[in-house]
Amino acid sequence: MGIEQLSCPACGATFEMGLPRDVTVQSVTTEDREEPDDDRVKVRPNACSNGHECYVMFRF
């Protein structure tokens, strides 16, 4: 597991998220997303230090 530095799409604040190694972050949005049909793509919620919810989509 590695720690990724991501930017909040609402305010630009940096937040950290633990992600499996060798993943590619595909998007960080404020809109909730459903899990894709592809087993290699996951969506996980998180929040920045300002309390904005965001959703991180990544691919294994």
UniProtKB/Swiss-Prot annotation:
Q: Which UniProt keywords apply?
A: Activator, Metal-binding, Transcription, Transcription regulation, Zinc, Zinc-finger
Segments forming C4-type zinc fingers: 8-52
Statement: the UniProt record of this protein carries the keyword Lipid biosynthesis: no
The record, for InterPro entries, names: Brz_Regulator (IPR053463)
MF GO annotations:
zinc ion binding
Function statement:
Activates transcription of bacteriorhodopsin (bop) and phytoene synthase (crtB1). May interact with DNA or RNA via the zinc finger motif.
Q: What is this protein called?
A: Transcriptional regulator Brz
| Lineage of the species this protein comes from | Archaea, Methanobacteriati, Methanobacteriota, Stenosarchaea group, Halobacteria
